[in-house]
Swiss-Prot record:
Lineage, uppermost ranks: Bacteria, Pseudomonadati, Campylobacterota, Epsilonproteobacteria, Campylobacterales
Disulphide connectivity of cysteines: none
GO MF entries: structural constituent of ribosome
Keyword tags: Ribonucleoprotein, Ribosomal protein
Native source organism of the sequence: Sulfurovum sp. (strain NBC37-1)
GO BP annotation list: translation
One of the Pfam families matching this protein, by short name: Ribosomal_L35p
GO CC annotations on file: cytosolic large ribosomal subunit
Protein name (record): Large ribosomal subunit protein bL35
Length: 63
């Protein structure tokens, strides 16, 4: 049986760390950020981890 192809959109959006957790970017950062207060804007810079519920599906898409 042939290997499953990875979902290229998921490969570009997620990275698997050494610990096995999946790193993702923050949503709502594209435009119209003048209305967002400075604290929230700074917090959106940092990357987040994917929830454990979604991690299994994302790992299947990446591999």
């Amino acid at each position: 049986m042939p290997k499953m192809k990875s979902v290229k959109g998921a490969v570009k959006r997620f990275k698997v760390k050494k610990s096995g957790k999946i790193k993702r970017g923050t949503a709502y950062r594209s435009h119209i950020l003048t209305k967002v207060d400075g604290k929230h804007h700074r917090q959106m810079r940092s990357s987040k981890h994917v929830d454990t519920v979604d991690a299994k599906n994302i790992k299947e898409m990446i591999n």
